[in-house]
């Protein structure tokens, strides 16, 4: 849809980051606002549209952030989480970005790191807010192929908003 129509707002309302004006989001039959955030975020991964970071993270550190919902409040990632993050980066094809500062990555590199961060959470649902924005054609194809593979081969449900109907149709379920 066009700019300013509310695509991002809709996604944020769906996952409880913004309130609905009326109605509610049901998550496994329960109002999402009545659930513990850890219960929600251990099942859903969200890749936001904005990509600026207040802190300097390496690719590996960014991917590790995806395990936060599975750790205690002050618990640091251990050897197991680091190995999971390294394996996820290998799976997504971005091991070369492990030590690169996210603020110095290209749009395509960062998007793949954010996808790896979302996947390490082992979600049942992944929500992508305009994942191809700012990417060149090659990186758009990489991201869209990854979304399609997640949905069709790995059974992860995906909700994606986009300005490009052709991109949406290329990864949509065709049942």
Residue positions per predicted region:
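Conserved catalytic motifs of ABC-family nucleotide-binding domains
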Residues: 122
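Conserved ABC ATPase signature
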Residues: 101-105, 109
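Helix-to-loop junction immediately C-terminal to a conserved catalytic motif
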Residues: 15
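Conserved ABC transporter NBD signature motif
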Residues: 23-31, 40
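Catalytic Walker B motif of ABC-type/P-loop ATPase nucleotide-binding domains
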Residues: 126-130
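H-loop/switch region of ABC-family ATPase nucleotide-binding domains
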Residues: 162-163
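Conserved ABC ATPase "signature" region
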Residues: 64, 79-97
């Amino acid at each position: 849809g066009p700019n300013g129509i509310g695509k991002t707002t809709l996604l944020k309302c769906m996952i409880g980051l913004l309130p609905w004006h009326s109605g509610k989001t049901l998550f496994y039959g329960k109002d999402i606002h009545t659930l513990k955030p850890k219960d929600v975020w251990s099942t859903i991964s969200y890749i936001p549209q904005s990509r600026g970071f207040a802190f300097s993270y390496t690719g590996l550190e960014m991917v590790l952030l995806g395990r936060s919902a599975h750790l205690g409040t002050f618990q640091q990632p251990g050897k197991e989480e680091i190995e999971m993050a390294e394996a996820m980066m290998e799976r997504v094809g971005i091991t070369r970005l492990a030590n690169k500062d996210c603020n110095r990555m290209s749009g395509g590199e960062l998007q793949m790191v954010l996808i790896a961060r979302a996947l390490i959470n082992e979600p049942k649902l992944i929500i992508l807010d305009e994942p191809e924005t700012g990417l060149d054609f090659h990186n758009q194809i990489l991201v869209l192929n990854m979304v399609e593979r997640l949905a069709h081969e790995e059974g992860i449900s995906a909700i994606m908003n986009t300005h490009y109907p052709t991109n949406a149709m290329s990864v949509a379920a065709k049942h």
